[in-house]
Amino acid sequence: MELTRENYNETAKELLTFLQNSPSCFHAVKNVVDMLTAAGFTEVKEEESWKLEAGGRYFVTRNQSSVIAFKVPGKDFKGFQIIASHSDSPTFKIKENPEMEAAHCIKLNVEKYGGMICAPWFDRPLSIAGRLVVSEGSRLVSKLVNVDRDLVMIPNLAIHMNRQVNDGYAYNAQKDMLPVFGSLEAKGTFMSLIAEAAGVKEEDILGHDLFLYNRQPGTIWGADETFLSCGRLDDLQCAFSSVKAVIEGENSSSISVAAIFDNEEVGSGTKQGADSTFLKDVLERINDSLGRTREQYLMAVASSFMISADNAHAVHPNHADVADPTNRPAINEGIVIKYNANQKYTTDAVSAAVFKALCKKVQVPVQTFTNRSDIAGGSTLGNISNAHVSLNTVDIGLPQFAMHSPYETAGVKDTCYFIKAATEFFNSCIVAEGNGNYSLGE
């Protein structure tokens, strides 16, 4: 299918709606589950026995913040074809007993989650979303909550009192970045407000995972309307695209898998993160439920392939010098393959070649990224999950500006590019032949 401006704009608007409805990782996974359910996927639970059938579509969640969706072509599958992304983004987590009185105001005690850009969080309407655990008789029930209005703000100190603010000021998370909740009249009302938003009684709330989020809606902008900006593009742009692709793709030889992990922004070392057994557990249970042997599982893993999808840095128009001199991704110019000699990214010659061949087949443009040799970069899902399920992996992402800002910018075209390439990935039968050789069939 040839992509058109109409395709780009329609998909961009759909993505922005998804982002708008996903103010926390819990809401993002809930929206993914809704997409999967509407497409005929059936939930299986880790606490229950799995009875998978040929032709079945399934998903499983962990902690309400990670989800793995998969399709079963039949018992005699050759391998797993996996796209991994993540549901979380840098933000602030509300601490226990958060209310603090200061200067005729009530502010909230929060702590930073992930490696954020601090400055853009100031002077803009924010709100709170996340998860509550509520007592219902003898049961404890998790409920999502979103205070869907402008609720708090982190005000800047006037330049007259902070002359260094434009000269590399170092923000103190405990002092500078606590959001104002209300006047003194709001004292003691935080939990009752949260309870009201969730439709529960305050006294029934026994636990909470609550986060700040930017209230500014996403938008498509630019003279030619080719940019889109919103919160949480990293990495919900890739997560959204992978779910669209696993729904659309059809494969008669391999298990198609879309895995969305939590806690990538804080190292992935949780039960629901990429550095957990979640993916390994799911793949093994698929194999076992279909009556296959342990050796057949290991053979399938050896013939599997994973795309680790986490957004990439585009060359910044005001800071072009910080990009590598020969690998310079641009927004709206295609999917970015990420390389790192020290294996912060898993891409090697073999995995890059497989991905390039898939993209070439459907005429999706590809770019390359590596850090300048004198600038350290980050890492992502691929090398972490490979410690538990070792398989050939390529690290890719969609190019963007302002990564880890509460309002990031990406391209209108690039979401379509990834959906198209990811769908082709799930349509293809990628088989390892050994010694770095692969066949890419239908």
What are these regions (language model features)?
Residues 1-442:
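N-terminal hydrophobic/helix-forming segments and targeting peptides
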